[in-house]
Amino acid sequence: RDEAFVRAECARLNVPLRVFHPADVGVAVPAHPGEDWARKLRYACFDALRAGGIDAVATAHTATDQTETLLFRLARGAGLHGAAGIRPSRPGFCRPLLCLTRAETEQVCTACGQRWVTDETNASDAYARNRLRHAALPALRSVNEAAEENFARFCEKAARADAYFAQ
């Protein structure tokens, strides 16, 4: 479903598309693939693109993803480096949407008439990140509507402090 949607949108917008499957990048599919496996697969695909001459990959991580990542890492005992969250850039990668929440990106897409698809696994509470998304984020928003933006700013400050202490 997701691949078909992306193929159709890329064709409509005349955007080149390269589709990878696990075997294309030498990633074995485990009996029970989970979030960590999916992330490794995505980055193996990104690495294959870069090896094929693509200079950089822009991901669609948002301030909402940043908040989820921070909460997830803190719950697992992260220190300052982990509290820096998703970095805006690193060699070969940029994340231009970190300044917008998921709701804001959806508003922009709606205003521009751009459709999107939501990964159906996002609805399942089988994944820790989804449990944070479904329970913690609404609770935080009830305390402060700007919670996601505030968490994103905290991650920026943590990244600066982490870089300072790494010198």
Can you say where each PLM-predicted feature lies in the sequence?
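Core alpha/beta nucleotide-donor-binding catalytic domains of modification enzymes
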Residues: 1-138
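ATP/NTP-dependent adenylation/nucleotidyl-transfer catalytic domains that generate, transfer
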Residues: 127-167
